[in-house]
């Protein structure tokens, strides 16, 4: 799985866990709807660190908490 795939998977996981809509995440993170759609559709090939910061903040967590999942372990990722 690519890093971007892992980010999308983590977003979906957290949306379910927190019973949060994508719209609410967009509002709380400051990420525009079009950009979020681009990420969630897999069309975005590079999710920047600043976007991950915004996502984590939107979920009310730190970046470390956002990335605290086995899907982000090096051996589980296709790193270019």
Task: Give the predicted meaning of each segment.
Residues 13, 67-80:
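Short, charged recognition helix plus adjacent turn
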Residues 12, 23, 53:
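Residues within the helices of the helix-turn-helix
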Residues 15, 26, 56:
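The alpha-helix within a helix-turn-helix
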Residues 31-46:
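Recognition helix of helix-turn-helix/homeodomain-like DNA-binding domains
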Residues 1-20:
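A short, Lys/Arg-rich alpha-helix, primarily the initiator
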Residues 43-57:
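Short, basic-rich loop-to-helix N-cap that marks the start of a DNA-contacting helix
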């Amino acid at each position: 799985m690519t890093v971007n795939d892992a980010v999308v998977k983590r977003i979906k996981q957290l949306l379910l866990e927190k019973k949060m809509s994508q719209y609410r995440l967009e509002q709380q993170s400051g990420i525009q709807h079009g950009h979020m759609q681009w990420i969630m559709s897999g069309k975005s090939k590079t999710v920047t660190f600043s976007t991950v910061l915004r996502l984590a903040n939107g979920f009310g967590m730190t970046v470390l908490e956002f990335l605290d999942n086995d899907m982000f372990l090096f051996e589980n990722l296709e790193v270019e």
